[in-house]
A protein has these predicted regions:
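Conserved C-terminal active-site "lid" loop/helix of NAD(P)H-dependent oxidoreductases
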Residues: 175-181, 198-237, 241, 245
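SDR active-site strand-loop-helix element
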Residues: 19-20, 57-62, 106-108
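NAD(P)-cofactor binding segment of oxidoreductase domains
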Residues: 30-58
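NAD(P)H-binding glycine-rich loop region in Rossmannoid oxidoreductase-like domains
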Residues: 1-38
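Substrate-binding strand-loop-helix patch
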Residues: 114-116, 140-149, 168-186, 236
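Mid/C-terminal beta-alpha module of Rossmann-like enzyme folds, strongest
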Residues: 153, 160-204, 245-248
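Catalytic helix-loop patch of NAD(P)-dependent Rossmann-fold dehydrogenases
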Residues: 30, 37, 41-42, 65-106, ...
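NAD(P)-dependent short-chain dehydrogenase/reductase
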Residues: 95-142, 147-156
Length: 252
């Protein structure tokens, strides 16, 4: 923390993006002390450092601050009601960040794209590529979000000098099962390898909200940014991968 404090005091950045998190929900349930330290205490320390240096914080949060029990998509002013420890600590961190009205909270959901850190899409593609079955929940919904579009929305927040809460998430509320089917179809894999399962059959420790889908219309109104639907978002990833391979062959 001292290194970070010295860096911020030296560079005096206009914006600090806080994306620190343990993203494994079951890990958070089993390691509550570590989770609270990273999500809440570290956020409080970073917020204090940034406020002293007049740096805006953009805090990356989650749809899991909601319980997922309502049928409509959640708006930014809906009251958080997390049902697992990950969501609980992220909701606490949001409150800390928003004590400064200049700061920003970006809630996102099930980020997908090209790379190792986007776990669900990587799991689906790696499995299908090897001819293995993919087991995906048919009763858990998310607003799956294209990674590149999420980054572009952050750029818009900085450009507009926005503040407050924004739901920076994809436009389609989709189950993991349907999402996996779309990935298989767009990438030309066998859709029959996608198998539907219920969260009730799973041995996960942390409770998952059933439908914490996010309404992203504020992004369009305030930031002038529109997220893609799931079909177009997955197609963008496919085109990105194609472009990477074309560049590889041109170089070698």
């Amino acid at each position: 923390m001292l290194v970070l404090k010295n860096l911020i005091e030296k560079e005096k950045p206009d914006v600090v993006i806080n994306a620190m998190a343990y993203s494994n929900l079951d890990f958070c349930e089993d390691h509550k002390k570590d989770t609270f330290l990273l999500h809440v205490e570290m956020t409080e320390k970073i917020s204090s450092i940034c406020e002293n240096n007049v740096s805006k914080i953009i805090f990356i949060s989650t749809d899991y601050v909601f319980d997922g029990k309502q049928n409509e998509k959640y708006n930014e002013d809906d009251e958080p009601n997390p049902i697992n420890y990950y969501g609980h600590t992220k909701a606490l961190a949001e409150k800390i960040v928003l004590k400064n009205p200049n700061n920003v909270v970006l809630r996102t959901s099930l980020v997908y794209g090209y790379g190792k850190r986007v776990r669900f899409m990587k799991y689906v593609l790696d499995s299908l590529k090897n001819g293995n079955e993919v087991f995906a929940y048919n009763d858990i919904f998310n607003s799956a979000t294209n990674l590149d579009e999420f980054v572009e929305s952050i750029e818009k927040v900085i450009e507009k000098n926005a503040n407050g809460i924004f739901h920076t998430s994809g436009s389609t509320c989709v189950t993991r099962y349907d999402f996996a089917k779309i990935i298989a179809r767009k990438f030309g894999f066998d859709e029959s390898l996608i198998k539907s399962i219920s969260i009730k059959e799973s041995k996960v420790k942390a409770k998952r909200p059933v439908k914490p889908c996010l309404n992203n219309s504020k992004c369009s109104k305030i930031l002038g940014y529109n997220f893609s639907n799931i079909e177009l978002g997955v197609l963008k990833v496919l085109n990105e991968i194609k472009n990477v391979w074309l560049l590889f062959w041109e170089l070698f």
